[in-house]
Amino acid sequence: MQIYDKAKKDRRNKDLLNIMKKHKVKLNFQKSQDETWGVVLDSNNKNATILFQKCDNPAASLAHELLHIITQLNGYKKIELWTSPKLDTEDFNILMAALDNELQHHKFYNQFISYGYKDKEFYVDSDKYTEIILRPKINSYIKSNNISLIKIIPDFLTTIGKGGHISEESKKEIIELFYSINNNQYETQLKNIGLIKKNGV
């Protein structure tokens, strides 16, 4: 039995899977190349490929991806990635992908919890190390004195995201560190990003 078969049998996912049937969405499963789970929904909203990997909470991981699908079925339009000769498109597209992902998370986090899952099950297993990884990165941003806003926003979004292993107390402390980058040059922009995300735009 594949790990996703076990996840599909979890009673907490029954309603989510029924929604897939209602919308006639065919679920295909493909092993991920890394530790993460993910999903790609085709333009017709009829075929979804769920990337899976062995993890501690496969049922929660499946629920997470099904909620991504449902969010899009309910009208959410994914942010399109693009290229431009005037921008560092790699950094820009990393930013857009992170923003798109976090906006969807904001929309369905409460649903995830309502199905009986815990906030610490919202992300991949390695999320438990996110704070350990984040702090040295932020310190390097602070020391650089010339880091661009576009490079720090993905990590900022990770910090202010709902759920996960970072405590609220630590989040507040880390957010203040972000504000201090480049002598508080980006504080206003980062606060505005936080407000947009809080209000669910």
What are these regions (language model features)?
Residues 46-62:
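Short pre-active-site segment immediately N-terminal to the catalytic Zn-binding motif
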Residues 64, 68:
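Histidine-centered divalent metal-coordination motifs
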Residues 60, 71-106, 194-201:
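Post-HEXXH active-site segment of zinc metalloproteases
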Residues 71-75, 112-117, 161-162:
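Hydrophobic/aromatic-lined pockets within catalytic cores
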Residues 79-82, 90, 97-98, 102-144:
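Active-site-proximal or metal-binding-adjacent scaffold patches in catalytic folds
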Residues 1-17, 58, 87-93, 115, ...:
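Short, structured coil/loop segments at alpha-helix boundaries
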Residues 1-45, 55, 94-102, 106-121:
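Auxiliary, metal-adjacent structural segments of Zn-dependent hydrolase domains
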Residues 126-201:
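Pan-zinc metallopeptidase signature
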